[in-house]
From Swiss-Prot:
SMART domains: KOW. Signal peptide: none annotated. Keywords: Ribonucleoprotein, Ribosomal protein, RNA-binding, rRNA-binding. This is Large ribosomal subunit protein uL24. It comes from Chlorobaculum parvum (strain DSM 263 / NCIMB 8327).
Length: 80
């Protein structure tokens, strides 16, 4: 029995220009920043932005809230 995760061949790769065709960000376009072939997901610039709460550290004792892109499923994007 095999163990591990199977890579999925995706139709997009890093630096491709894509348009979101499904979900809350439908109609938005951007550049692919990162691809996760094992999960079948991609990170698109300016799409699926969420707030991330950062703990206080020595460099930033106040802590912070940053906004960044999170992955979306590759089937929800198409090349433009």
């Amino acid at each position: 029995m095999k163990t591990g995760i199977k890579k999925i061949k995706l139709h997009v790769k890093k630096n491709d220009d894509v348009v979101v065709i499904a979900g809350n960000d439908k109609g938005k376009s951007g550049k692919v920043l990162k691809v996760f072939p094992q999960k079948g997901r991609v990170i698109v610039e300016g799409v699926n932005i969420r707030k991330r709460h950062m703990r206080p550290t020595q460099t930033s004792p106040q802590g912070s809230i940053i906004e960044r892109e999170f992955p979306i499923h590759a089937s929800n994007v198409k090349k433009s």
